[in-house]
Amino acid sequence: QIVYLARLHGFSKADATAEATAILEQLGLGERLGDNVETLSLGNQQRAQIAAALVHDPQVLILDEPFSGLDPIAVDVVAGVLQERAARGAAVIFSSHQLDVVERLCDDLVIIAGGTIRAAGPRERLRDEHSTRRYELISSGDAGWLRTEPGVEMINFDGGYALFDVDEEATAQRVLRRAVAEGDVASFAPQHPTLAQIFKEVIQ
């Protein structure tokens, strides 16, 4: 079936067979080359459908929920194939509710809810736009002093670990200076929201 689809796009029989074999092996279906789609598991059927979309080496690839029904290993395999195609210059567009995968793969994002675009743009710009003044501190000393620090709202605290919000950036710099004075600081960094957190924010 995959060979037939390649033939429809002008491949010779030999080239179609070679291309179909290569993409199926790349997607982890090398041992199932002669099987009918109906005999495959749902996850393998999904991978076979992706192979059908890729076999003619399209320059624009539009996929609807390509990771649906896949186990974590298969997700990584398919993600790697899509990244490889994008690196070769193909435009890869896909919809997905698996936001951790979307965040890992995509350079540009569009969040749609109720038929309306709620947010769109480069991934890092969206993260910056929806960032709060939240910081994480990891130090050798006890970070309990943060609970009484002006302009600081403690979110989580455990010994030398603290997650907290500040009212302004100047407060964050003041906190860092005191943290250094209190003991060795292993890490002090702003916390950017995940795509899942941005999604929840923009659809509310």
Language model features with spans:
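C-terminal coupling/interaction segments
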Residues: D167-Q204
